[in-house]
Amino acid sequence: MIQVFSERKDKPVQYGFVDLGGAPLPNEVDYPTVEFSTSPDGINWTSAYDVKNMENVHCYSSPNVPVAKKTNQTKKIGFQDGERIVSTSFDSRELKFKLVYKGVSQTDAMLAFESAQRFLVSREAYWITFADWLGRMYYGTAVMGDPEFSVNDWTCEVTFTDLMGLSRSIGTSLSPVEDEWGVNNNVPNNGDYPPYTFKENKFSVYNLSDIYIDPERQGHQLKIVVKGAAGDNFQIKNLTTGDYIKRPKGFSGTWELDGVNPTLNNEGDLLNITGTHGGVITLNNGKNDFQVDNFSGEISFDFPFWRLS
């Protein structure tokens, strides 16, 4: 399990009704709060609530549902009317959220802003996620607008540039479902979460992303791990896309296809491989039917899910 958010029991919350003559609890505030965390690698996370010098710095307005910005590369075909799409890519986009600080002195307010800036502003891109949009993370960099000070308080708008133009699941297809798959995740209509480890030679792999998975042209992560024994002409074929990868010579042990790089028992295996584009497997959106020839053992598919929002 990946620990994304703080384990504190006293996280800031907006208070509700208070008994006559009563007072809010120390962790209750008069505005909504949304926890957010950052990570350099998508695995090791730091919540803003766990940064000591950001005490009382809260996100009170998280980003709206991000809009996907698509660009089509088109080409004129002979004398045909119009144009045809050659390729499609998603452009970077901006996610805006707002911070608020309420303190006891102007000095504390300035120090809190400095700490927030250190937490969010970096030369290097990183991942960010928000607790009200579970299971999704965005990769990019942030800039902070000028703070609006009011005695001991301030508010500030943060602009995060999502460099990929898509969100990614924090977990992968092999992660525990309840931990990292997120909400609104394209699970099939029967509501059952599909498996991604198989012992059969015919099975279906569900790509729950909003886009197809293409390790070669898009650099998407896709690791196929085969453990067992294979005879000559071992082959994995995606019957839905027509992609296949083939190894003429048999083997035993662990064979992996990590993106476009095949290995056998941790040794490079590219020279022994044939197939689509030299042995590349892609996944369509939704259901992909697979067939594995001349193999006995276990095969798993490990990849993150990509969302438009």
Task: Cite the ranges covered by each PLM segment.
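Glycine/small-residue-rich interface belts in oligomeric ring/scaffold proteins
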Residues: 48-99, 112-117
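Structured, non-membrane catalytic/scaffold regions adjacent to prosthetic-group chemistry
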Residues: 100-127
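Solvent-exposed loop and beta-edge segments used for protein-protein assembly and interaction
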Residues: 89-93, 120-122, 150-154, 216-218, ...
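Intrinsically disordered, low-complexity segments enriched in serine, threonine, and glycine
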Residues: 2-7, 174-309
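Short beta-strand and beta-hairpin "edge-sheet" elements
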Residues: 122-169
